[in-house]
Curated annotation (Swiss-Prot):
Catalytic activity as recorded in UniProt: Hydrolysis of DNA containing ring-opened 7-methylguanine residues, releasing 2,6-diamino-4-hydroxy-5-(N-methyl)formamidopyrimidine; 2'-deoxyribonucleotide-(2'-deoxyribose 5'-phosphate)-2'-deoxyribonucleotide-DNA = a 3'-end 2'-deoxyribonucleotide-(2,3-dehydro-2,3-deoxyribose 5'-phosphate)-DNA + a 5'-end 5'-phospho-2'-deoxyribonucleoside-DNA + H(+)
Assembly and interaction partners: Monomer.
Pfam families (alphabetical): Fapy_DNA_glyco, H2TH
Record's keyword annotation contains DNA damage: yes
Protein name: Formamidopyrimidine-DNA glycosylase
Stretches assigned to coiled coil: none
SMART domains attached to this UniProt entry: Fapy_DNA_glyco, H2TH
One GO-annotated biological process of the protein: base-excision repair
Its job: Involved in base excision repair of DNA damaged by oxidation or by mutagenic agents. Acts as a DNA glycosylase that recognizes and removes damaged bases. Has a preference for oxidized purines, such as 7,8-dihydro-8-oxoguanine (8-oxoG). Has AP (apurinic/apyrimidinic) lyase activity and introduces nicks in the DNA strand. Cleaves the DNA backbone by beta-delta elimination to generate a single-strand break at the site of the removed base with both 3'- and 5'-phosphates.
Record key words, sorted: DNA damage, DNA repair, DNA-binding, Glycosidase, Hydrolase, Lyase, Metal-binding, Multifunctional enzyme, Zinc, Zinc-finger
Cofactor(s) essential for the protein: Zn(2+)
SUPFAM superfamilies attached to this UniProt entry: Glucocorticoid receptor-like (DNA-binding domain), N-terminal domain of MutM-like DNA repair proteins, S13-like H2TH domain
Length: 290
């Protein structure tokens, strides 16, 4: 599933192309994804101007102007396999898993606009369209925790949110009400960099441990964004290119390999271990992470 770095990468790629552009044509090829699409979705989008693109947690938020309803927000969640790819028009025939295609007006001095295609093989993504005034109260956004790259996320705030939690720290960090946007890959990588075991009880991650974990999270996310995210299965950037952060994984997907943090001997120690927590694979070094 695309996590914060992948969604942020897509946001930046789309922003460079479609910010300020008008949606002149919108083609919708099915009535639903994970949930039903909004009523009159394509008709309501057509003719609106893209005023800006933002991200909250794993959600892409597109601000639209020009509607009789007032400013609108188009919320996009990519689910497990959703992609948004932009290219020069005109649009061709839709592929078997292309569910929404929109075309913009041409940028100044150019003959063709941009065509953006939403493709989703598993159809686990979803979209919504609602008045901007309802943004903070939207059910998908209202209870989210702080942004890990924002000014409101520091060791003190993380310690406060983890206080009293007796779940493993891995599960706590995946809780979107604790911190927004983290997923399995980046939690594994962040805990490794901080030297914290994913089995450790969340409430014990305070003080110096929280002081190590917060910059580790920030560094992992920042580096992943710079690399265009991680392409393991379906994810591609908005230009159709793969992300490259998967080549920088220290522990994720590296079961049985030597730990880059302690150079342990896999024959003697087993190297990087894989365990299952809450139904998800966790990768870590039991010797390096405590």
């Amino acid at each position: 599933m695309p996590e914060l770095p992948e969604v942020e990468t897509v946001r930046r790629g789309l922003e460079m192309k479609i910010a300020g552009r008008v949606l002149v044509r919108v083609a919708q090829y099915r009535p639903d994804l994970r949930f039903p699409l909004p009523e009159r979705f394509a008709a309501r989008l057509t003719g609106l101007r893209v005023a800006g693109l933002f991200r909250r947690a794993k959600y892409l938020l597109i601000r639209l102007e020009g509607s009789a309803e007032g400013p609108l927000v188009w919320l996009v969640h990519l689910g497990m396999s959703g992609t948004l790819v932009v290219r020069r028009g005109p649009p061709g025939p839709p592929g078997p898993h292309d569910h929404l295609v929109f075309e913009t007006d041409p940028p100044p001095g150019e003959a063709q606009g941009w065509v953006v295609t939403y493709n989703d093989v598993r159809r686990f993504g979803f979209m919504d369209l609602f008045p901007e005034a309802l943004l903070d109260s939207h059910p998908m956004l209202a209870c989210l925790g702080p942004e890990p790259l924002g000014n409101g996320f520091d060791a003190e705030e993380l310690s406060r949110r983890l206080a009293g939690k007796i779940t493993p720290i891995k599960a706590a960090l995946l809780d979107q009400t604790v911190v927004a946007g983290l997923g399995n890959i980046y939690v594994c990588e962040s805990l490794f960099r901080a030297g914290i075991s994913p089995r450790r009880l969340a409430h014990t991650v305070a003080g110096r441990r929280a002081g190590r974990l917060v910059p580790a999270i920030r560094d992992v996310l920042t580096e992943a964004i710079a690399a265009g995210g991680s392409s393991l299965r379906d994810y591609v950037q908005s230009d159709g290119e793969l992300g490259y952060f998967q080549h920088s994984f220290k522990v994720y997907g590296r079961e049985g390999e030597p730990c880059p943090g302690c150079d342990c001997d896999p024959v003697r120690t087993g190297g990087i271990a894989r365990i299952v927590q809450s139904g998800r694979s966790t990768f870590y070094c039991p010797r390096h992470q405590r």
